[in-house]
Every structure is written in structure tokens, then in C-alpha cells.
């Protein structure tokens, strides 16, 4: 079970965007990376293609961040938190390690 999933609110704990929060828009498990909305923005220079009707220029988009550089945000403590996984009944659930509160309630 993945500890960070699409839709989770995370906080960046290392790198140039340290301290910024955002929602995970995509998880790339084979590379252990996540894409967070409006965090780690990079500029891409694109060439226009008149056959497809696209214009060239400089576009800004989110670049992936390694999953070890983000931590899930706990709204109750308003800090970054660690995630645990435990069995409840017949399914696994994620919980915050600091206060044992369920994430997937």
C-alpha cells in the first residue's frame, strides 16, 4: 500500500520549494516520484507545430519531486506527519503516526 496517494495534501520537506504545501496530482510509482500542484514549477521551451495548430513558446509546468522529499500534511497538528498502515477488519487503512487519526476515513 502506498503511503502517499493522488489527492493527498503534502508539504515539501527538502529542496528549493521546502515548506510549500499542495495536493498530489499524480504518483509515478516506478520512479518513486510525485507531481504536486503549483510546486516545483519549471519552464519548458516548446516548438510550435503549424500542422497540429499549436503555437510555440515558454510554458510553465510542474516537475516531479522524489517521494522522500514530501511528507503528508496533518491538518489537526498543522505539521508534516508520518504515515502508518494497519489492518482494520478486512481492509488496510492509513493513519497519522502522531495522533493515530485515520487518513482514509
Curated annotation (Swiss-Prot):
Belongs to the universal ribosomal protein uL24 family. Keywords: Ribonucleoprotein, Ribosomal protein, RNA-binding, rRNA-binding. The keyword tRNA processing does not apply. It comes from the Bacteria. InterPro entries: KOW, Rib_uL2_dom2, Ribosomal_uL24, Ribosomal_uL24_CS, Ribosomal_uL24_KOW, Translation_prot_SH3-like_sf. GO terms for cellular component: ribonucleoprotein complex; ribosome. GO terms for molecular function: rRNA binding; structural constituent of ribosome. The gene is rplX. This is Large ribosomal subunit protein uL24. The lineage of its organism: Bacteria, Pseudomonadati, Pseudomonadota, Gammaproteobacteria, Chromatiales. One of two assembly initiator proteins, it binds directly to the 5'-end of the 23S rRNA, where it nucleates assembly of the 50S subunit. It holds the Pfam family KOW. Part of the 50S ribosomal subunit. GO terms for biological process: translation.
Amino acid at each position: 500500500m502506498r503511503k502517499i496517494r493522488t489527492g493527498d495534501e503534502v508539504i515539501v520537506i527538502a529542496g528549493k520549494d521546502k515548506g510549500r504545501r499542495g495536493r498530489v496530482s499524480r504518483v509515478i510509482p516506478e520512479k518513486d516520484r510525485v507531481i504536486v500542484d503549483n510546486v516545483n514549477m519549471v519552464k519548458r521551451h516548446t516548438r510550435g507545430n503549424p500542422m497540429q495548430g499549436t503555437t510555440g513558446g515558454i510554458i510553465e509546468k510542474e516537475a516531479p519531486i522524489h517521494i522522500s522529499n514530501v511528507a503528508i500534511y496533518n491538518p489537526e497538528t498543522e505539521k508534516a506527519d508520518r504515515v502508518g498502515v494497519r489492518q482494520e477488519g478486512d481492509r488496510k487503512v492509513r493513519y497519522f503516526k502522531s495522533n493515530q487519526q485515520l487518513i482514509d476515513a
